[in-house]
Amino acid sequence: MLLLCNYYITYRCNAYCEFCHFGDHTNFKDTPFAKLDEFKSNVGQLAKLGVKFIDLTGGEPLLHKDIHLMAEFAHNLKMQTSITTNTLLYPKFAEKLAGKINLLHFSLDSPDEEEHNRIRKVDCFKSIFKSIEIAKSLGEFPDILFTVTNETYKKLPRMNELAAKHDLVLLVNPVFSYFSNPGLSQEAVDYVDEYCDGKMDVYLNKAFMKLRRDGGNDIHNPSCKAVSRVIVISPKNEIILPCYHFANDKIKIDRPISEIRKSEKLRYFIKNEGKFDFCQGCTVNCYFEPSFAFPTNLYAISSLTSKFKYSYNKLVKQKIKKKFTPKTESR
């Protein structure tokens, strides 16, 4: 059952984050942007196939000149939309995106300006707080997304204070091991898990931490549903298999997606999802979030309290605030 589309609308980025392979611009500076007509065709088909969530991702998604049109199109199809941005371009698109993004995430890697800018290798710390001001003036409640690393995990209390100061949810994103990037140490896992426990204004999927303690995905008893519940589409109009981070094959979208989903190649990848050698020990968050969507195993059950808490913040608390908070003109 397809739930989520990770749609890479660009591989290009305007930052150089040390924990992200998109930070190496030499590999991506000449890559194409997703075409709007192809996007609309694909997303329209996905809506009919039952996809409920779409992450407009990159790279830096706001580098795409049609990002607002893409968000509007998906939103009008009743999809839940999400964007994660470093905010450098958010002021340019803020008004056009307002009301069209269900989950708007502003990336902040440290409460200290110097450290954040060093990690990103670009001066963008002040842009985040300017963007928070603009977003809230438009009735938006972005989350502050903190990608926790072995170097920054002890900054978590200060990040919580900073998010609370702006009346926003802190979304804790534990770094995962991929493209030679190390994952969290056991000490960091324990610290983060203990700190976040019971805090209503902090979201951490507890299943992510259990998965790390258990050594990641086990290919002999896989937890991953990266093919059956997620579809990954590239800017080149290809379906990436089994996932972006361990791309092993690609299928050009040159026929209806429903036909592709029934193809022998897709059935092969669904049958073997989480079972490939490279799947051993995997902890890539963006595939395990939908993998734990239904309470069918201990990981999914572990994630329930976290998801209920986040849903309360986004669907109840913030909606009430939006209703009673007048919009003001952004500067």
Q: Which residues does each PLM region occupy?
A:
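Short, solvent-exposed loop/helix junctions and linker helices
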Residues: 33, 64, 149-150, 276
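Short glycine-rich, flexible loops that bind phosphorylated cofactors or substrates
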Residues: 63, 113, 291
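Flexible mid-to-C-terminal extensions adjoining Fe-S/redox cofactors in radical SAM and related proteins
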Residues: 1, 23, 238-331
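Conserved alpha-helical substructure of the radical SAM core
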Residues: 1-96, 100-103, 295, 304, ...
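Flexible loop residues that form catalytic
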Residues: 25, 59, 109, 175, ...
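Residue-level marker of regulatory loop/turn positions in helix-turn-helix DNA-binding domains and
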Residues: 1-2, 216, 225, 271
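Radical SAM enzyme [4Fe-4S]-AdoMet core and its adjacent flexible, acidic
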Residues: 29, 77-80, 100-103, 107-255, ...
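The −1 position to Zn-ligating cysteines in a subset of zinc-ribbon hairpins
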Residues: 12, 16, 223, 278-281
